Amino acid sequence: MKHMTRALVGGLGVTVLLVGCGGEDMRGFPTSDGSEEQLIARAASYELDTEYVPPPGEALHHHTAGFAKILCSGVFITGLDADDAAANVGGFISPFDERQYVVDTVIDYEQQMVSLTLPDGVTRTARRYGNQGCVAHPIGQSEVFFTPSEVERDLPPAETTPWPMGDVLPDDAWPAELDMEKVEQALEAGFGPPEARTLGLVVTYNGRILGERYGDGIDIHTPLESWSMTKSLTGTLIGVLIEQGVYDLWEPAPIPEWQGEGDPRQEIRIGDIMRMSSGIRINAPADPDFNEDFYADHYYLYTGTVNSYEYAATRPQQWPPNTIGRYRNTDPVLASYLVRLGVEGAGMDYHSFPQQHLFDRIGVRDGLIETDPYGNFLGQGLAFMPARDWARLGNLYLQDGIWEGERVLPEGYADYASEVAPAWDADGRRIYGGAFFWVNGEGGLGIPDTAYRMLGAGGQSTTIIPTHGLVVVRLGKY
């Protein structure tokens, strides 16, 4: 370990110095060079004759619902100061410059509830519901439309259990060829200065924690917002169901709303959805032809306080599946819907499923996924876990889905996650894989081309580097 690899890790390019150590056939499809002009032209060649209907409601009301949820989660899940959360968290679903329109803020610490009132008299509220996290309510409502569930954990005491199933780290010496001075330099560089707003950084080497850093008030058990890294967690839950025999990766997605006679959405496979290639029509900021005149469905699935699964499942098809790759929240919401359908269809408890069938198996004690008012996991971006728990999840993939000798994910599922999605490849953007992972197919990140990542807004990242046995997790305010 005498050389170092400089790697860009995270959506905002947080620089981390890492210590080095020794599908389908798309032939005949039009391709593009990845330019905006050609992306739009290529998509137009596949366009289906369906209508786009924008989300209902006023943008400011939606933004303020997002703000109430952000404050609730920041204060009652992560333990941030309310002013800190208001100034530094969640600007993409609740723009910071619109938070000034709130004329009254009430934070009820006993009820764990946030209420924000606007000049037109509309009040948006969000409340903590145990393991279902903070949930924003529809206008005029102060409760949710489901019975919150108590989720029990079946794990030994963390303080006496060795890593990775617990918190006790080995005190064995590292191999002599590992330059620990350079490791410390890498950790300092990766954590960055205060303006980087990093809250947690964990690096593991061959499954063992090589080093970690935390911000003020944050420790190894603090649940941190992951934003869209949650998508990869949702893809993992689908993988668990596939390993259990509930689903097959390439079966048509059994979405009830798609089962009408002649519905073309019946051709969409589960594997297409998790490649962000379903072709479902919405308006999303990452689209090359995003229409700013409408409030984005992509955000509405966070802030609409509707049945998010029903909303996503009733959007029409814009392109045939597996032809066009677009980063849209409908796909992870549809995958989350499939999790609920599969879990309940198999007679398992829905809200307990992530803990009992994934988290308990890999040592995760402090994770949760927030829901919409109907109790549906918002698997596109509202999971909270400590940095160490994201490292555990990354190591599950590094180990090809096997944990302590037991297979958790199907054989080859890590390959599916780390391979470039054919539709994205044909679009000239070799950046997205399967199971809602990002890939390094275009190179240029300073890490091996085989590396793949869970990514979330604001530089949230879990980077898996199989060739070097590394997993790097970075979480911070955004």
Please place each PLM-identified region on the residue numbering.
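C-terminal motif of bacterial Sec signal peptides marking the signal peptidase cleavage site
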Residues: 17-20
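Beta-lactamase-like hydrolase cores
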Residues: 162-206
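Active-site SXXK
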Residues: 207, 224-250, 273, 335-339, ...
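Bacterial signal peptide processing site
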Residues: 22-25
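Active-site Gly/Thr loop motif
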Residues: 364-371, 415-471
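Active-site helix/loop module of the DD-peptidase/beta-lactamase fold
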Residues: 244-281, 285, 314-318, 344-385
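Active-site-proximal alpha-helical segments within enzyme catalytic domains
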Residues: 235, 276, 331-340, 381-402, ...
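Short, charged, amphipathic alpha-helices and their helix-cap/turn boundaries
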Residues: 181-187, 208-213, 247, 252, ...
